[in-house]
Structures are given as structure tokens and as C-alpha cells.
């Protein structure tokens, strides 16, 4: 039986984590203690930290980390008093969450699930959804935003890190534009070969219309936005944005 692209991506990310992928390295005990003392930052995108005012007071808030495994953000939210749940499709990313929770002796609900399917939560379940860059690993993003709207409480906050497509236009050295958009390896064999050669799993470009428009169509009100770079490489050196982070509210 042929593996789904979602399964291929989960296995790819598991392998990256074993190889030392930066987004799969859990925070240290010291970082956790610092967060308990009010010294903390988290990332939705590679470089610029999320403004603290985007969150408000997290004490006793129900927080979902959507495709947010790895033991980097959820431990911080726990240290700040949040009641946390994490959903991811990578076993290794979820193992990191379990490891930090056991080390720091806190409880977190850990769920392995595919975010392209109906999310396994009741309506109006969460105060905040934290969704760092990850929807570049799924083909259709609008259904995810609809599900986020469904499971957030009224007044709930959706925080997203979004790849805006620039990365998919350029070659590996980021010197030449080699691809048209949309980048979709399920329909473009040449793009699939590029990903296989670079061990990048199955990735997809998404437009601003899909991503911010998708949030608005789901019913959210956008309240803030900032852009960000890759953190390394030629596009970063030229200060060319590849990502945006968004804050939206369910009214």
C-alpha cells in the first residue's frame, strides 16, 4: 500500500530530528526555569519572537499546540500556567514533548493526529491555538483554519507562522528563480524530484490569499501581523521575507 504524503512527511521529520534538526531539539531545564521566572520567548517563524502581548495572561488558559511538537513551545506555555495539549504527526516530536513533561513533572495531553483530518476536539475547546510554520507540509490549508475556528472558544486567539512561498521559487543556493508557483509535488513531477534530492519530504507553497484569506473566510478577525526571514541563506542575507506570523481572533 502506498504511503500518504502525510505519512512520508512524518517519517521525514522523525529522521530529521534524529539528525539534530533545530526544530526538534527540546528546551533545557534552565530555559524552563527562566520561563517560570518570566524570562521567555517563543517562535512562530524562524527568527523574530512572538510579541508577548499577542498572548495575554496564560494562567489557566487552554492552549493547543497544533503541529507544534518538539518540546520547544509547549513547555514554555506550561511554565506560564497554561493547560496544554499538543497535536503532531511525528512520533519523535511527540517523544520530545513527553520527555520534557516528565523531566519537569507537569501534565500535557499528547495526541498523534493528522491535521488534514477533522481535529479530535469538541467545539469551543481552547482559548489559544499556537500553530508554528508547518502547513507547508499539507496540500490544503483552508480546512485547517475552519477546524481551528470550530475548536476555539469565542474570543479565542489563533497564532500562526506561515511560509508565503518565496522559498519554493528559488534554487538550493537561493540565487536563481527556478520554479513557478504553486509548488505542488503531487501534480508536478519535477518539483517532487527536487524535494527528493534535497530530502525535504513533501512540501507545498501557499499564497497569502489561501493563508490569511483562509483565516478570514473561516470567520477570524486578523488583529496583527509581522514578517520574517529564513534565519540563514541568501534570502535572509538580503532581508527578503519568506514568512509571516499572524494573530487572529474568533469573535
Model-found features: residue ranges?
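Conserved alpha-helix/loop element of class I SAM-dependent methyltransferases that forms part
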Residues: 27-61
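Core SAM-dependent methyltransferase catalytic element
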Residues: 218-220, 234-251
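A short glycine-rich, Lys/Arg-flanked "PGG" loop and its adjoining helix->strand segment in the class I
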Residues: 142-157
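A short acidic, Gly/Pro-enriched loop at the edge of an enzyme's catalytic core
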Residues: 116-128
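Short alpha-helix
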Residues: 202-225
